[in-house]
Amino acid sequence: MGTQRNGYSKRETFILSVDVGTTSIRCHVYDKSASIRGSCSAKVSLLYPQPGWVEIDPDELWDGFVTVVKGAVQDSGLQMCQMESLGISTQRATFMTWDRNTGKPFHKFITWQDMRAAELVRSWNGSCTMKTVHGVMKMLHFLSRQKRFLAASLVVFTTQHVSLRLVWALNNIPQLRQAVEDGTCYFGTIDTWLLYKLTKGLVHATDYSNASATAIFDSYQMCWSGFLCSLLSIPLSILPKVQDTSHKFGLCDSSIFGVPIPIMCVMADQQAAMFGECCFDTGDVKITMGTGTFMDINTGSKPHTSVAGLYPLVGWKIGADVVYLAEGNAAGTGAAIKWAQDLELFSDVKETEAIATSVEDSDGVFFVPSFSGLQAPLNDPKACASFMGLKPSTTKRHLVRAILESIAFRNKQLFDVMLRETRIPITKIRADGGVCTNDFIMQLTADLLGRKIARPSHFDMSCLGAAFVAGLGTGYWRNQEELKKLLSTDQHFLPRRSKSEGEKGGLYRGVLQSWEKALQRSMHWYNQP
Protein backbone atom coordinates (compact mmCIF):
# COMPACT_ATOMS: atom_id res chain seq x y z
CA MET A 1 0.00 0.00 0.00
CA GLY A 2 1.59 3.28 -1.04
CA THR A 3 1.04 6.54 -2.85
CA GLN A 4 0.85 6.59 -6.64
CA ARG A 5 -0.50 9.07 -9.14
CA ASN A 6 0.59 7.95 -12.59
CA GLY A 7 0.09 5.08 -15.02
CA TYR A 8 -3.68 4.65 -14.94
CA SER A 9 -6.18 3.82 -17.63
CA LYS A 10 -9.27 5.96 -18.06
CA ARG A 11 -11.29 2.78 -17.77
CA GLU A 12 -9.98 2.16 -14.27
CA THR A 13 -12.21 2.96 -11.33
CA PHE A 14 -11.30 4.02 -7.82
CA ILE A 15 -12.74 4.28 -4.33
CA LEU A 16 -13.29 7.61 -2.57
CA SER A 17 -13.13 7.67 1.21
CA VAL A 18 -13.60 10.55 3.63
CA ASP A 19 -12.82 10.60 7.36
CA VAL A 20 -14.44 13.38 9.39
CA GLY A 21 -12.40 13.61 12.58
CA THR A 22 -12.43 15.96 15.54
CA THR A 23 -9.78 18.30 14.15
CA SER A 24 -9.70 17.57 10.41
CA ILE A 25 -11.53 16.15 7.39
CA ARG A 26 -9.41 13.96 5.12
CA CYS A 27 -10.22 12.41 1.75
CA HIS A 28 -8.18 9.79 -0.11
CA VAL A 29 -8.62 8.20 -3.52
CA TYR A 30 -7.69 4.49 -3.39
CA ASP A 31 -6.88 2.12 -6.22
CA LYS A 32 -7.17 -1.70 -6.36
CA SER A 33 -3.90 -2.17 -4.47
CA ALA A 34 -5.16 0.18 -1.72
CA SER A 35 -2.54 2.71 -2.78
CA ILE A 36 -3.45 6.36 -2.31
CA ARG A 37 -3.74 8.12 -5.69
CA GLY A 38 -4.76 11.52 -4.35
CA SER A 39 -5.47 13.26 -1.05
CA CYS A 40 -6.87 16.45 0.39
CA SER A 41 -7.56 17.65 3.92
CA ALA A 42 -9.19 20.57 5.69
CA LYS A 43 -9.34 21.68 9.29
CA VAL A 44 -12.43 21.30 11.44
CA SER A 45 -13.04 24.45 13.47
CA LEU A 46 -14.31 23.82 16.98
CA LEU A 47 -16.49 26.56 18.48
CA TYR A 48 -16.63 27.39 22.19
CA PRO A 49 -19.66 29.70 22.60
CA GLN A 50 -19.83 29.16 26.38
CA PRO A 51 -17.56 27.54 28.97
CA GLY A 52 -17.76 23.77 28.53
CA TRP A 53 -19.62 23.96 25.20
CA VAL A 54 -17.90 22.53 22.11
CA GLU A 55 -19.67 22.87 18.76
CA ILE A 56 -19.08 22.52 15.02
CA ASP A 57 -20.78 24.70 12.42
CA PRO A 58 -22.72 22.31 10.11
CA ASP A 59 -22.41 24.55 7.04
CA GLU A 60 -18.66 24.85 7.49
CA LEU A 61 -18.38 21.08 7.93
CA TRP A 62 -20.39 20.47 4.76
CA ASP A 63 -18.29 22.95 2.77
CA GLY A 64 -15.13 21.25 4.06
CA PHE A 65 -16.46 17.83 3.06
CA VAL A 66 -17.21 18.90 -0.51
CA THR A 67 -13.87 20.71 -0.75
CA VAL A 68 -11.74 17.70 0.28
CA VAL A 69 -13.57 15.32 -2.07
CA LYS A 70 -13.04 17.63 -5.04
CA GLY A 71 -9.48 18.33 -3.93
CA ALA A 72 -8.52 14.67 -3.59
CA VAL A 73 -9.85 13.80 -7.05
CA GLN A 74 -8.04 16.81 -8.53
CA ASP A 75 -4.84 15.81 -6.71
CA SER A 76 -5.08 12.30 -8.18
CA GLY A 77 -5.24 13.58 -11.74
CA LEU A 78 -8.33 11.42 -12.22
CA GLN A 79 -11.90 12.32 -13.12
CA MET A 80 -14.92 12.26 -10.84
CA CYS A 81 -16.65 9.78 -13.17
CA GLN A 82 -13.92 7.24 -12.32
CA MET A 83 -14.99 7.17 -8.67
CA GLU A 84 -16.84 3.86 -8.27
CA SER A 85 -18.16 4.46 -4.76
CA LEU A 86 -17.83 6.60 -1.64
CA GLY A 87 -17.15 5.49 1.92
CA ILE A 88 -17.51 7.81 4.92
CA SER A 89 -15.97 7.48 8.39
CA THR A 90 -16.92 9.96 11.12
CA GLN A 91 -16.22 10.88 14.70
CA ARG A 92 -18.83 9.36 16.98
CA ALA A 93 -21.54 10.79 19.22
CA THR A 94 -21.43 14.33 17.75
CA PHE A 95 -25.01 15.17 16.79
CA MET A 96 -27.43 17.77 15.51
CA THR A 97 -31.18 18.16 14.94
CA TRP A 98 -32.79 19.86 11.94
CA ASP A 99 -36.06 20.49 10.13
CA ARG A 100 -36.77 17.47 7.92
CA ASN A 101 -38.49 19.62 5.28
CA THR A 102 -36.14 22.58 4.98
CA GLY A 103 -32.88 21.04 6.23
CA LYS A 104 -32.42 24.03 8.55
CA PRO A 105 -30.55 23.09 11.75
CA PHE A 106 -32.08 23.95 15.13
CA HIS A 107 -28.57 24.28 16.60
CA LYS A 108 -24.95 23.58 15.68
CA PHE A 109 -23.37 20.15 16.07
CA ILE A 110 -22.96 19.37 19.78
CA THR A 111 -19.70 17.42 19.91
CA TRP A 112 -18.72 14.42 22.00
CA GLN A 113 -16.42 16.73 24.02
CA ASP A 114 -19.26 19.09 25.00
CA MET A 115 -19.95 19.36 28.76
CA ARG A 116 -23.25 21.27 28.78
CA ALA A 117 -25.11 18.19 30.06
CA ALA A 118 -22.74 17.63 33.01
CA GLU A 119 -25.34 18.65 35.59
CA LEU A 120 -27.96 16.44 33.95
CA VAL A 121 -25.49 13.53 34.02
CA ARG A 122 -24.81 14.03 37.75
CA SER A 123 -28.51 14.35 38.49
CA TRP A 124 -29.54 11.24 36.54
CA ASN A 125 -26.70 9.04 37.81
CA GLY A 126 -27.55 9.89 41.41
CA SER A 127 -31.32 9.72 41.02
CA CYS A 128 -33.73 7.32 42.69
CA THR A 129 -34.98 6.45 39.20
CA MET A 130 -31.58 5.07 38.17
CA LYS A 131 -31.18 3.19 41.45
CA THR A 132 -34.57 1.59 40.84
CA VAL A 133 -33.66 0.76 37.24
CA HIS A 134 -30.39 -0.85 38.34
CA GLY A 135 -32.18 -2.89 41.01
CA VAL A 136 -34.93 -4.11 38.69
CA MET A 137 -32.46 -5.01 35.95
CA LYS A 138 -30.25 -6.94 38.38
CA MET A 139 -33.31 -8.94 39.43
CA LEU A 140 -34.28 -9.60 35.80
CA HIS A 141 -30.73 -10.74 35.08
CA PHE A 142 -30.78 -13.05 38.11
CA LEU A 143 -34.05 -14.61 36.94
CA SER A 144 -33.34 -14.80 33.20
CA ARG A 145 -29.50 -14.83 33.02
CA GLN A 146 -29.83 -12.65 29.92
CA LYS A 147 -26.77 -10.44 29.57
CA ARG A 148 -28.71 -7.50 28.18
CA PHE A 149 -30.34 -7.11 31.61
CA LEU A 150 -26.92 -7.21 33.27
CA ALA A 151 -25.80 -4.50 30.83
CA ALA A 152 -28.85 -2.38 31.70
CA SER A 153 -28.12 -2.80 35.43
CA LEU A 154 -24.70 -1.23 34.86
CA VAL A 155 -25.86 1.77 32.78
CA VAL A 156 -24.12 4.98 33.83
CA PHE A 157 -24.55 8.17 31.82
CA THR A 158 -21.58 10.28 30.73
CA THR A 159 -21.31 13.57 28.86
CA GLN A 160 -19.63 11.73 25.98
CA HIS A 161 -22.87 9.87 25.30
CA VAL A 162 -25.44 11.41 22.97
CA SER A 163 -28.31 10.57 25.35
CA LEU A 164 -28.28 13.39 27.91
CA ARG A 165 -26.84 16.00 25.55
CA LEU A 166 -29.89 15.32 23.36
CA VAL A 167 -32.14 15.59 26.42
CA TRP A 168 -30.51 18.97 27.16
CA ALA A 169 -31.26 20.13 23.60
CA LEU A 170 -34.88 18.94 23.80
CA ASN A 171 -35.31 20.80 27.10
CA ASN A 172 -33.60 24.05 26.12
CA ILE A 173 -34.27 24.74 22.43
CA PRO A 174 -37.92 25.83 21.89
CA GLN A 175 -37.85 25.45 18.07
CA LEU A 176 -36.64 21.88 18.47
CA ARG A 177 -39.42 21.03 20.92
CA GLN A 178 -42.00 22.52 18.57
CA ALA A 179 -40.63 20.55 15.61
CA VAL A 180 -40.86 17.33 17.63
CA GLU A 181 -44.52 18.10 18.37
CA ASP A 182 -45.14 18.91 14.69
CA GLY A 183 -43.37 15.74 13.51
CA THR A 184 -40.85 17.71 11.44
CA CYS A 185 -37.67 17.01 13.43
CA TYR A 186 -34.72 14.89 12.32
CA PHE A 187 -31.90 13.81 14.65
CA GLY A 188 -28.58 12.62 13.36
CA THR A 189 -24.91 12.15 14.05
CA ILE A 190 -22.45 13.55 11.49
CA ASP A 191 -22.85 10.59 9.12
CA THR A 192 -26.64 11.05 9.04
CA TRP A 193 -26.33 14.77 8.28
CA LEU A 194 -23.87 14.11 5.46
CA LEU A 195 -26.17 11.47 3.94
CA TYR A 196 -29.07 13.94 4.13
CA LYS A 197 -27.00 16.65 2.41
CA LEU A 198 -25.44 14.38 -0.22
CA THR A 199 -28.85 13.04 -1.28
CA LYS A 200 -30.61 16.43 -1.09
CA GLY A 201 -32.81 15.31 1.80
CA LEU A 202 -33.83 11.92 0.38
CA VAL A 203 -32.05 9.79 3.00
CA HIS A 204 -32.31 9.88 6.81
CA ALA A 205 -30.17 6.97 7.94
CA THR A 206 -27.16 5.79 9.92
CA ASP A 207 -25.36 2.49 10.30
CA TYR A 208 -25.07 0.06 13.21
CA SER A 209 -21.53 1.12 14.17
CA ASN A 210 -22.53 4.77 14.61
CA ALA A 211 -25.86 3.96 16.27
CA SER A 212 -24.21 1.68 18.84
CA ALA A 213 -21.95 4.54 19.99
CA THR A 214 -24.85 6.86 20.94
CA ALA A 215 -25.82 5.06 24.21
CA ILE A 216 -29.47 5.00 23.10
CA PHE A 217 -29.05 1.87 20.97
CA ASP A 218 -29.60 -1.71 22.16
CA SER A 219 -26.67 -3.72 20.76
CA TYR A 220 -28.27 -6.96 21.98
CA GLN A 221 -31.56 -6.39 20.13
CA MET A 222 -29.91 -4.43 17.29
CA CYS A 223 -32.38 -1.54 17.41
CA TRP A 224 -32.89 1.82 19.10
CA SER A 225 -33.49 1.23 22.80
CA GLY A 226 -37.20 1.79 23.43
CA PHE A 227 -36.50 1.46 27.16
CA LEU A 228 -33.82 4.18 27.32
CA CYS A 229 -35.65 6.50 24.93
CA SER A 230 -38.81 6.15 27.01
CA LEU A 231 -36.88 6.69 30.25
CA LEU A 232 -35.32 9.90 28.88
CA SER A 233 -38.39 11.07 26.90
CA ILE A 234 -36.50 10.91 23.59
CA PRO A 235 -39.04 10.44 20.76
CA LEU A 236 -38.18 7.45 18.56
CA SER A 237 -39.76 9.29 15.61
CA ILE A 238 -36.79 11.66 15.24
CA LEU A 239 -34.16 8.89 15.03
CA PRO A 240 -32.73 7.75 11.67
CA LYS A 241 -33.22 4.32 10.14
CA VAL A 242 -30.33 2.00 11.00
CA GLN A 243 -28.81 0.25 7.98
CA ASP A 244 -26.00 -2.23 7.40
CA THR A 245 -22.50 -0.72 7.37
CA SER A 246 -22.11 -1.96 3.80
CA HIS A 247 -25.25 -0.68 2.11
CA LYS A 248 -26.18 1.44 -0.89
CA PHE A 249 -27.34 4.44 1.13
CA GLY A 250 -28.09 6.45 -2.00
CA LEU A 251 -26.44 8.48 -4.73
CA CYS A 252 -24.63 11.77 -4.29
CA ASP A 253 -26.80 14.31 -6.09
CA SER A 254 -25.18 15.13 -9.44
CA SER A 255 -25.23 18.85 -8.68
CA ILE A 256 -22.59 18.33 -5.95
CA PHE A 257 -19.76 16.48 -7.73
CA GLY A 258 -21.04 16.44 -11.30
CA VAL A 259 -21.81 12.70 -11.27
CA PRO A 260 -24.05 10.51 -9.07
CA ILE A 261 -21.48 8.63 -6.95
CA PRO A 262 -22.96 5.69 -4.95
CA ILE A 263 -22.56 6.03 -1.17
CA MET A 264 -21.71 2.45 -0.13
CA CYS A 265 -20.55 2.87 3.47
CA VAL A 266 -20.94 5.06 6.52
CA MET A 267 -19.04 3.96 9.59
CA ALA A 268 -17.88 5.20 13.01
CA ASP A 269 -14.18 6.09 13.09
CA GLN A 270 -12.85 3.56 15.61
CA GLN A 271 -14.78 0.71 14.04
CA ALA A 272 -13.57 1.84 10.62
CA ALA A 273 -9.97 1.84 11.89
CA MET A 274 -10.53 -1.71 13.16
CA PHE A 275 -11.72 -2.74 9.69
CA GLY A 276 -8.85 -0.89 8.03
CA GLU A 277 -6.40 -2.82 10.23
CA CYS A 278 -8.09 -6.05 9.00
CA CYS A 279 -8.96 -7.07 12.57
CA PHE A 280 -11.67 -9.39 11.27
CA ASP A 281 -11.20 -12.32 13.64
CA THR A 282 -12.25 -12.87 17.25
CA GLY A 283 -9.35 -11.86 19.50
CA ASP A 284 -7.88 -9.30 17.11
CA VAL A 285 -6.94 -6.08 18.94
CA LYS A 286 -6.47 -2.55 17.62
CA ILE A 287 -4.90 0.32 19.59
CA THR A 288 -5.51 3.81 18.20
CA MET A 289 -3.40 6.48 19.90
CA GLY A 290 -4.46 9.96 18.86
CA THR A 291 -6.35 12.65 20.76
CA GLY A 292 -7.22 9.79 23.09
CA THR A 293 -6.36 6.11 23.19
CA PHE A 294 -8.97 3.63 22.00
CA MET A 295 -8.32 -0.07 22.49
CA ASP A 296 -10.75 -2.41 20.75
CA ILE A 297 -11.01 -6.18 20.74
CA ASN A 298 -13.07 -8.19 18.27
CA THR A 299 -15.49 -10.22 20.45
CA GLY A 300 -17.04 -12.08 17.53
CA SER A 301 -20.77 -12.53 17.06
CA LYS A 302 -21.83 -11.54 20.60
CA PRO A 303 -21.63 -8.22 22.47
CA HIS A 304 -19.52 -8.15 25.62
CA THR A 305 -21.13 -7.14 28.91
CA SER A 306 -18.59 -5.26 31.03
CA VAL A 307 -18.45 -4.47 34.73
CA ALA A 308 -15.23 -2.44 34.47
CA GLY A 309 -16.10 0.18 31.88
CA LEU A 310 -15.42 -1.53 28.55
CA TYR A 311 -18.07 -0.41 26.08
CA PRO A 312 -19.88 -2.95 23.87
CA LEU A 313 -20.09 -1.74 20.27
CA VAL A 314 -21.27 -3.04 16.95
CA GLY A 315 -18.10 -3.17 14.88
CA TRP A 316 -19.91 -3.58 11.57
CA LYS A 317 -22.81 -5.37 9.96
CA ILE A 318 -22.23 -6.64 6.44
CA GLY A 319 -25.10 -8.77 5.19
CA ALA A 320 -25.87 -11.38 7.84
CA ASP A 321 -22.41 -10.97 9.39
CA VAL A 322 -22.44 -8.91 12.60
CA VAL A 323 -19.14 -8.32 14.42
CA TYR A 324 -19.03 -6.86 17.93
CA LEU A 325 -16.23 -5.04 19.70
CA ALA A 326 -15.43 -4.24 23.31
CA GLU A 327 -13.73 -0.87 23.71
CA GLY A 328 -11.76 0.79 26.45
CA ASN A 329 -10.51 4.34 26.15
CA ALA A 330 -8.07 6.64 27.87
CA ALA A 331 -8.79 10.30 27.23
CA GLY A 332 -6.03 12.86 26.96
CA THR A 333 -3.26 10.90 25.21
CA GLY A 334 -2.53 13.50 22.56
CA ALA A 335 -3.71 16.26 24.89
CA ALA A 336 -0.94 15.42 27.38
CA ILE A 337 1.71 15.66 24.67
CA LYS A 338 0.24 18.92 23.34
CA TRP A 339 0.16 20.35 26.89
CA ALA A 340 3.83 19.46 27.38
CA GLN A 341 4.66 21.16 24.08
CA ASP A 342 2.74 24.29 25.11
CA LEU A 343 4.80 24.27 28.33
CA GLU A 344 7.91 24.26 26.11
CA LEU A 345 9.21 20.94 27.42
CA PHE A 346 10.05 20.39 23.75
CA SER A 347 9.48 22.33 20.51
CA ASP A 348 8.64 19.47 18.12
CA VAL A 349 6.71 16.31 18.99
CA LYS A 350 9.19 14.32 16.90
CA GLU A 351 11.88 15.19 19.47
CA THR A 352 10.13 13.41 22.34
CA GLU A 353 11.47 9.94 21.56
CA ALA A 354 15.10 11.13 21.55
CA ILE A 355 14.52 13.19 24.70
CA ALA A 356 13.00 10.22 26.54
CA THR A 357 15.83 7.87 25.60
CA SER A 358 18.51 10.44 26.51
CA VAL A 359 17.98 9.57 30.19
CA GLU A 360 18.12 6.10 31.74
CA ASP A 361 14.80 6.50 33.53
CA SER A 362 12.39 9.18 34.76
CA ASP A 363 14.37 9.65 37.99
CA GLY A 364 11.37 8.58 40.08
CA VAL A 365 9.01 11.09 38.44
CA PHE A 366 5.51 9.90 37.51
CA PHE A 367 2.85 11.58 35.40
CA VAL A 368 -0.87 10.87 35.69
CA PRO A 369 -2.56 11.75 32.35
CA SER A 370 -6.04 12.54 33.63
CA PHE A 371 -6.94 15.96 32.24
CA SER A 372 -10.41 14.54 31.57
CA GLY A 373 -10.62 12.16 34.51
CA LEU A 374 -9.74 8.47 34.33
CA GLN A 375 -11.68 6.03 32.20
CA ALA A 376 -11.68 2.20 32.27
CA PRO A 377 -10.87 0.37 34.44
CA LEU A 378 -10.81 3.10 37.13
CA ASN A 379 -13.74 5.19 35.89
CA ASP A 380 -13.09 8.25 38.05
CA PRO A 381 -14.23 11.55 36.47
CA LYS A 382 -12.92 13.44 39.53
CA ALA A 383 -9.27 12.41 39.06
CA CYS A 384 -6.71 15.15 38.44
CA ALA A 385 -3.65 15.23 36.22
CA SER A 386 -0.42 15.37 38.20
CA PHE A 387 3.34 15.01 38.37
CA MET A 388 4.65 13.19 41.43
CA GLY A 389 8.16 12.51 42.65
CA LEU A 390 9.60 15.86 41.58
CA LYS A 391 12.98 16.68 43.11
CA PRO A 392 15.85 19.16 42.56
CA SER A 393 17.53 16.70 40.18
CA THR A 394 14.44 16.51 37.92
CA THR A 395 15.01 17.86 34.40
CA LYS A 396 12.77 18.47 31.40
CA ARG A 397 14.01 15.19 29.98
CA HIS A 398 12.69 13.28 33.00
CA LEU A 399 9.31 15.02 32.68
CA VAL A 400 9.03 14.14 28.99
CA ARG A 401 9.95 10.51 29.67
CA ALA A 402 7.37 10.32 32.48
CA ILE A 403 4.65 11.63 30.14
CA LEU A 404 5.46 9.09 27.42
CA GLU A 405 5.67 6.28 29.97
CA SER A 406 2.23 7.18 31.34
CA ILE A 407 0.66 6.59 27.91
CA ALA A 408 2.15 3.09 27.77
CA PHE A 409 1.08 2.44 31.37
CA ARG A 410 -2.53 3.30 30.54
CA ASN A 411 -2.28 0.97 27.53
CA LYS A 412 -1.21 -1.78 29.93
CA GLN A 413 -4.20 -1.09 32.20
CA LEU A 414 -6.66 -1.21 29.31
CA PHE A 415 -5.12 -4.40 27.96
CA ASP A 416 -5.22 -6.14 31.34
CA VAL A 417 -8.89 -5.36 31.93
CA MET A 418 -9.67 -6.45 28.38
CA LEU A 419 -7.96 -9.81 28.97
CA ARG A 420 -9.55 -10.27 32.38
CA GLU A 421 -13.07 -9.40 31.30
CA THR A 422 -13.41 -10.91 27.84
CA ARG A 423 -11.26 -14.02 28.42
CA ILE A 424 -10.72 -14.10 24.68
CA PRO A 425 -7.30 -15.32 23.47
CA ILE A 426 -5.49 -12.47 21.72
CA THR A 427 -4.67 -13.30 18.11
CA LYS A 428 -2.88 -10.13 17.00
CA ILE A 429 -2.37 -6.49 18.00
CA ARG A 430 -2.11 -3.61 15.55
CA ALA A 431 -1.59 0.06 16.40
CA ASP A 432 -2.43 3.26 14.54
CA GLY A 433 -2.96 6.97 15.14
CA GLY A 434 -0.52 9.85 15.25
CA VAL A 435 1.02 8.95 18.64
CA CYS A 436 1.98 5.47 17.43
CA THR A 437 4.75 7.05 15.34
CA ASN A 438 6.66 7.36 18.64
CA ASP A 439 8.91 4.28 18.84
CA PHE A 440 9.52 4.74 22.59
CA ILE A 441 5.80 4.45 23.40
CA MET A 442 5.36 1.56 20.97
CA GLN A 443 8.30 -0.44 22.34
CA LEU A 444 7.36 0.14 25.97
CA THR A 445 3.76 -0.87 25.23
CA ALA A 446 5.00 -4.10 23.60
CA ASP A 447 7.24 -4.77 26.62
CA LEU A 448 4.45 -4.21 29.13
CA LEU A 449 1.89 -6.25 27.19
CA GLY A 450 4.41 -8.99 26.42
CA ARG A 451 3.04 -9.10 22.88
CA LYS A 452 4.19 -8.31 19.37
CA ILE A 453 2.56 -5.13 18.05
CA ALA A 454 2.37 -4.32 14.34
CA ARG A 455 2.42 -0.72 13.12
CA PRO A 456 1.03 -0.05 9.61
CA SER A 457 2.86 1.89 6.92
CA HIS A 458 0.02 4.44 6.84
CA PHE A 459 -1.84 5.69 9.89
CA ASP A 460 -5.11 6.87 8.33
CA MET A 461 -6.85 3.60 9.10
CA SER A 462 -10.36 5.03 9.52
CA CYS A 463 -10.31 6.27 5.93
CA LEU A 464 -8.93 2.97 4.67
CA GLY A 465 -11.53 0.99 6.61
CA ALA A 466 -14.44 2.94 5.11
CA ALA A 467 -12.86 2.51 1.67
CA PHE A 468 -12.54 -1.25 2.19
CA VAL A 469 -16.21 -1.58 3.18
CA ALA A 470 -17.37 0.60 0.27
CA GLY A 471 -15.22 -1.40 -2.15
CA LEU A 472 -16.51 -4.74 -0.89
CA GLY A 473 -20.04 -3.46 -1.43
CA THR A 474 -19.49 -2.93 -5.16
CA GLY A 475 -17.25 -5.94 -5.73
CA TYR A 476 -14.17 -3.73 -6.21
CA TRP A 477 -12.50 -6.08 -3.74
CA ARG A 478 -13.77 -9.64 -3.49
CA ASN A 479 -13.44 -10.56 0.18
CA GLN A 480 -11.67 -9.91 3.46
CA GLU A 481 -8.83 -12.30 2.61
CA GLU A 482 -7.96 -10.11 -0.37
CA LEU A 483 -7.93 -7.06 1.89
CA LYS A 484 -5.49 -8.71 4.32
CA LYS A 485 -3.01 -9.15 1.47
CA LEU A 486 -3.20 -5.42 0.69
CA LEU A 487 -2.32 -4.32 4.23
CA SER A 488 1.32 -3.33 4.69
CA THR A 489 3.24 -3.12 7.96
CA ASP A 490 5.93 -0.55 8.71
CA GLN A 491 7.40 -2.24 11.76
CA HIS A 492 6.84 -4.99 14.34
CA PHE A 493 7.66 -4.20 17.96
CA LEU A 494 8.70 -7.34 19.84
CA PRO A 495 8.57 -7.44 23.65
CA ARG A 496 11.93 -7.30 25.40
CA ARG A 497 12.30 -9.45 28.49
CA SER A 498 14.27 -8.76 31.63
CA LYS A 499 17.26 -11.12 31.88
CA SER A 500 16.98 -11.18 35.65
CA GLU A 501 13.21 -11.55 35.92
CA GLY A 502 12.38 -13.29 32.65
CA GLU A 503 8.87 -11.82 32.64
CA LYS A 504 6.98 -9.53 30.32
CA GLY A 505 7.59 -5.94 31.33
CA GLY A 506 9.91 -7.17 34.09
CA LEU A 507 12.24 -4.20 33.71
CA TYR A 508 9.32 -1.91 34.44
CA ARG A 509 7.41 -3.90 37.04
CA GLY A 510 8.54 -1.78 40.01
CA VAL A 511 8.12 1.46 38.05
CA LEU A 512 4.59 0.50 37.05
CA GLN A 513 3.67 -0.28 40.66
CA SER A 514 4.96 3.13 41.79
CA TRP A 515 3.03 4.83 38.98
CA GLU A 516 -0.14 3.06 40.13
CA LYS A 517 0.41 4.56 43.60
CA ALA A 518 0.63 8.01 42.01
CA LEU A 519 -2.56 7.20 40.12
CA GLN A 520 -4.41 6.34 43.32
CA ARG A 521 -3.34 9.62 44.93
CA SER A 522 -4.69 11.57 41.95
CA MET A 523 -8.13 9.99 42.17
CA HIS A 524 -11.22 11.66 43.72
CA TRP A 525 -9.37 14.99 43.73
CA TYR A 526 -12.15 17.28 42.53
CA ASN A 527 -15.50 17.70 44.25
CA GLN A 528 -17.24 17.60 40.88
CA PRO A 529 -16.09 16.17 37.52
UniProtKB/Swiss-Prot annotation:
Biological process (GO), any one: triglyceride metabolic process
**Family listed:** Belongs to the FGGY kinase family.
- Keyword Kinase among UniProt keywords: yes
Task: Please list the residues that bind ATP.
Answer: T22, T23, T291, G334, G434
* Top-level class of the enzyme under EC nomenclature: transferase
Q: Which UniProt keywords apply?
A: ATP-binding, Cytoplasm, Glycerol metabolism, Kinase, Nucleotide-binding, Transferase
Q: Which domain of life is it from?
A: Eukaryota
Question: What Gene3D superfamilies is this protein classified in?
Answer: 3.30.420.40
The entry's protein name is Glycerol kinase 5
Q: Where does glycerol bind?
A: R92, D269, Q270
Functional pathway: Polyol metabolism; glycerol degradation via glycerol kinase pathway; sn-glycerol 3-phosphate from glycerol: step 1/1
Q: What does this protein do?
A: Skin-specific kinase that plays a key role in glycerol metabolism, catalyzing its phosphorylation to produce sn-glycerol 3-phosphate. Involved in skin-specific regulation of sterol regulatory element-binding protein (SREBP) processing and lipid biosynthesis.
Q: What is its main location?
A: cytoplasm
- Pfam families to which the protein is assigned, alphabetical: FGGY_C, FGGY_N
Q: Which reaction does it catalyse?
A: glycerol + ATP = sn-glycerol 3-phosphate + ADP + H(+)
Position of the signal peptide? none
Entry's localization field? Cytoplasm
Q: Name one GO cellular component term.
A: mitochondrion
GO MF terms held by the record: ATP binding; glycerol kinase activity
In short, the EC number is: 2.7.1.30
